[in-house]
């Protein structure tokens, strides 16, 4: 094997914790090597060491057989190590060319920037990536997929021999992800080595050559993709086999009382009109392709998106949800798709994030908060939901994605909200945490909570939901339940002009 990267015995300690303990990793030239592990397994820390962001406390980094010690990120870049972070590092106001050459502009003899030369170089890079980029437009005006390719182009413009891709498909459509995989295969053909981090095992089996698994900061093993299967990988990741991710569905009474009734909801002017109801203890799926209207309809329910509605009732009482505050008062809560930017205050503690929706719950006198009571409530919710963190005072931006999602759920439970809208609840979390979220959602429904689930993951829709509203071009094409909830039927209604009996669904 023509090894380009060899990590040997990498150990990293932070105050009070050993983040990595004796990690070994070998990556071959022209190989796509998957790095797997649950959130908190040590993947990010290991990659930050490789990129010069953190120094290792023990161990050796070798590139092409030569030991290296990176004092900073620039040293790693100079050695040919590039990384595309899950959260982009682009300057939104600058165009793609300026982002590619930021801080290292090409200049002529008089010190003037050689704009035409940099533009030609950028055009050549994107041509090699087989992607069309408007080189004059600010990157904020580009699609998420195009921004992803600008990040990759930036790394390649630095002559990266080893490219780290951290969850690169997290915000891409299936077609965009397929294009990315084609680009990765072409880079592989040219001899570029890649470390691919993803929670989607199907992607790893599609594009990777070998897999290294970490668990709890330790090396578990390396295997060839062709010699393993999903069950074996999951067991390596979590230390146990997860035979069934989805808890069994209970049999709900068809005449269960509706807790939310929506009559004639129209999200856009002259758009389709939908009617539906959510029953007590039910998980109702909103399925459909991106842009089908499922998310905009859910946002309209909490007053976060302007919409027309003839009538809306919560537990039989007419309500008018003009804004999220009115929805909160009516007992409707949203767990947004973007936890970090919309669902949490990252720099705040677990306690403060949970308490923020219900500050009056533990108020003393008029203006003072009983901090001890808040802490007790936070501890109870952490134990109830299985939030893994040292204390209630831990900052949420230090938690894994699964634990962050549990904190968002805890916030709504602290407010006694009984109608919950989960928007892409498992995006960016590992397979073990996904199973915990699925179990938690089913436990909540068994206790009488009513849930709307929006998900692009078809197995989640099929495996969790009691009924499924399938959206297409803003219209509910069908309301499926029972044995009708199966992948082919859902996709048929989501992609074809097939109408359910009518568009008034109770």
UniProtKB/Swiss-Prot annotation:
<dbReference type="InterPro" id="IPR027417">
    <property type="entry name" value="P-loop_NTPase"/>
</dbReference>
<dbReference type="GO" id="GO:0005886">
    <property type="term" value="C:plasma membrane"/>
</dbReference>
<protein>
    <recommendedName>
        <fullName>Ribose import ATP-binding protein RbsA</fullName>
        <ecNumber>7.5.2.7</ecNumber>
    </recommendedName>
</protein>
<dbReference type="GO" id="GO:0015611">
    <property type="term" value="F:ABC-type D-ribose transporter activity"/>
</dbReference>
<dbReference type="InterPro" id="IPR003593">
    <property type="entry name" value="AAA+_ATPase"/>
</dbReference>
<feature type="domain" description="ABC transporter 2">
    <location>
        <begin position="254"/>
        <end position="498"/>
    </location>
</feature>
<feature type="domain" description="ABC transporter 1">
    <location>
        <begin position="5"/>
        <end position="241"/>
    </location>
</feature>
<dbReference type="GO" id="GO:0005524">
    <property type="term" value="F:ATP binding"/>
</dbReference>
<comment type="subunit">
    <text>The complex is composed of an ATP-binding protein (RbsA), two transmembrane proteins (RbsC) and a solute-binding protein (RbsB).</text>
</comment>
<keyword id="KW-0067">ATP-binding</keyword>
<keyword id="KW-0762">Sugar transport</keyword>
<dbReference type="InterPro" id="IPR017871">
    <property type="entry name" value="ABC_transporter-like_CS"/>
</dbReference>
<keyword id="KW-1278">Translocase</keyword>
<comment type="function">
    <text>Part of the ABC transporter complex RbsABC involved in ribose import. Responsible for energy coupling to the transport system.</text>
</comment>
<keyword id="KW-1003">Cell membrane</keyword>
<keyword id="KW-0547">Nucleotide-binding</keyword>
<keyword id="KW-0677">Repeat</keyword>
<dbReference type="InterPro" id="IPR003439">
    <property type="entry name" value="ABC_transporter-like_ATP-bd"/>
</dbReference>
<dbReference type="GO" id="GO:0016887">
    <property type="term" value="F:ATP hydrolysis activity"/>
</dbReference>
<comment type="similarity">
    <text>Belongs to the ABC transporter superfamily. Ribose importer (TC 3.A.1.2.1) family.</text>
</comment>
<feature type="binding site">
    <location>
        <begin position="37"/>
        <end position="44"/>
    </location>
    <ligand>
        <name>ATP</name>
    </ligand>
</feature>
<keyword id="KW-0472">Membrane</keyword>
<dbReference type="InterPro" id="IPR050107">
    <property type="entry name" value="ABC_carbohydrate_import_ATPase"/>
</dbReference>
<keyword id="KW-0813">Transport</keyword>
<dbReference type="Pfam" id="PF00005">
    <property type="entry name" value="ABC_tran"/>
</dbReference>
<keyword id="KW-0997">Cell inner membrane</keyword>
């Amino acid at each position: 094997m023509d090894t380009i990267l060899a990590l040997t015995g990498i150990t990293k300690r932070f105050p009070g914790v050993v983040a990595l303990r004796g990690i070994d990793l070998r990556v071959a030239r022209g190989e796509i090597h998957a790095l797997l592990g649950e959130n908190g397994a040590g993947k990010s820390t290991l990659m930050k060491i490789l990129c010069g962001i953190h120094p290792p406390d023990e161990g050796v980094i070798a590139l092409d057989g030569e030991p290296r010690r990176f004092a900073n990120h620039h040293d790693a870049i100079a050695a040919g190590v590039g990384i595309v972070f899950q959260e982009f590092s682009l300057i939104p106001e600058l165009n793609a060319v300026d982002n590619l050459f930021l801080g290292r502009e090409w200049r002529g003899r008089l010190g003037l920037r050689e704009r035409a030369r940099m533009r030609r170089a950028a055009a050549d890079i994107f041509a090699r990536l087989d992607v069309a980029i408007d080189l004059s437009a600010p990157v904020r005006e580009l699609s998420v997929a195009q921004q992803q390719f600008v990040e990759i182009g930036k790394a390649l413009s630095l002559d990266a021999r080893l490219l780290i891709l951290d969850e690169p498909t997290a915000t891409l459509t299936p077609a965009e992800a397929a294009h990315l995989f084609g680009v990765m295969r072409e880079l592989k053909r040219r001899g570029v080595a890649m470390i691919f981090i993803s929670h989607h095992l199907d992607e790893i089996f599609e594009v990777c050559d070998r897999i290294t698994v970490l668990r709890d900061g330790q090396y578990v093993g390396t295997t060839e993709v062709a010699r393993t299967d999903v069950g074996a990988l999951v067991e390596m990741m979590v230390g146990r086999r997860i035979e069934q991710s989805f808890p069994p569905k209970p049999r709900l009474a068809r005449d269960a009382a509706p807790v939310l009734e929506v009559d004639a909801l129209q999200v856009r002017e002259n758009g389709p009109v939908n009617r539906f109801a959510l029953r007590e203890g039910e998980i109702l799926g909103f399925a459909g392709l991106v842009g089908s209207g499922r998310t905009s309809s859910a946002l309209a329910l909490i007053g976060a998106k302007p919409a027309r509605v003839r009538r809306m009732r919560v537990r039989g009482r007419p309500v008018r949800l003009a804004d999220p505050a009115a929805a909160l008062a009516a007992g409707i809560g949203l767990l947004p798709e973007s936890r970090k930017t919309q669902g949490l205050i990252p720099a705040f503690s677990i306690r403060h994030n949970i308490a923020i929706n219900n500050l009056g719950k533990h108020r003393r006198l008029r203006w003072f908060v009983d901090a001890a009571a808040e802490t007790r409530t936070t501890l109870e919710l952490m134990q109830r939901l299985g939030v893994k963190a040292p204390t209630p005072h831990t900052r949420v931006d230090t938690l894994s994605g699964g634990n962050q999602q549990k904190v968002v759920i805890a916030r709504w439970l602290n407010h006694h909200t009984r109608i919950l809208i989960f928007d892409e609840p498992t995006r960016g979390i590992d397979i073990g945490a996904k199973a915990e979220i699925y179990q938690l959602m089913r436990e909540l429904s068994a206790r009488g909570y009513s849930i709307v689930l929006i998900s692009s993951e078809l197995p989640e829709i099929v495996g969790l939901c009691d009924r499924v509203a399938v959206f297409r071009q803003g219209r509910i094409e069908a309301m499926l339940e029972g044995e009708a909830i199966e992948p082919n039927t859902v996709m048929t209604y989501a992609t074809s002009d097939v109408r359910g009996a009518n568009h008034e669904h109770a």
